């Protein structure tokens, strides 16, 4: 989930670990491309996995640990499940838990992003908010830094305090860093 959120947060217009520029490249061309670390290498690696290239071969060309390559493979395998099960609510729920965007699911299902959202809404598939453990479980900390996820338990505590909304963009934006977000709104 985190990886796909990170890809979307790059604000490059890409909503998934897919980039069309690798569609027409040969496997050999992509293997040569991934030998060097670039800002779009992850898309090239995902394309090789889609094509069934063995992860050990990808490892040999990137030296990226197999643990991480397996995580990319899990995402690619879920892409196949999504494409094969158009409109399936449980697949939608699982895809959201893996971090798939409504836009990408819509592309797989020949729907637009709004239609996927409405399907989620009709089936009560919404994000919940989890608390970030800022102390790595070393000791208890009640700092209300939250992130959204499609898991089950919501750790957000609703209060009766007055609410505000912060609008705008610039050097410090909401979502840039949790410590900045928190100081901006408290």
Stretches with model-predicted labels:
Residues 1-186:
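ATP-dependent carboxylate/acyl-activation modules
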């Amino acid at each position: 989930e985190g990886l796909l959120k990170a890809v979307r947060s790059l604000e490059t217009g890409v909503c998934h670990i897919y980039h069309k520029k690798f569609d027409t490249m040969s496997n050999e061309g992509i293997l040569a491309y991934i030998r060097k670390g670039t800002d779009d290498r992850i898309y090239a690696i995902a394309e090789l996995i889609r094509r069934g290239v063995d992860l050990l071969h990808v490892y040999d060309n990137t030296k990226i640990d197999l643990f991480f390559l397996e995580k990319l493979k899990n995402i690619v395998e879920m892409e196949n499940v999504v494409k094969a099960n158009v409109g399936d609510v449980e697949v939608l729920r699982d895809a959201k838990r893996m971090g798939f965007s409504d836009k990408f699911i819509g592309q797989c299902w020949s729907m637009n992003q709004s239609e996927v959202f409405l399907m989620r809404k009709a089936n009560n598939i919404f994000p919940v908010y989890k608390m970030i453990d800022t102390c790595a479980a070393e000791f208890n900390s009640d700092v209300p830094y939250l992130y959204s996820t499609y898991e089950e338990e919501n750790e957000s505590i609703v209060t009766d305090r007055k609410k505000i909304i912060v609008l705008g963009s610039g050097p410090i934006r909401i979502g840039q860093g949790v410590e900045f977000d928190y100081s901006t709104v408290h």
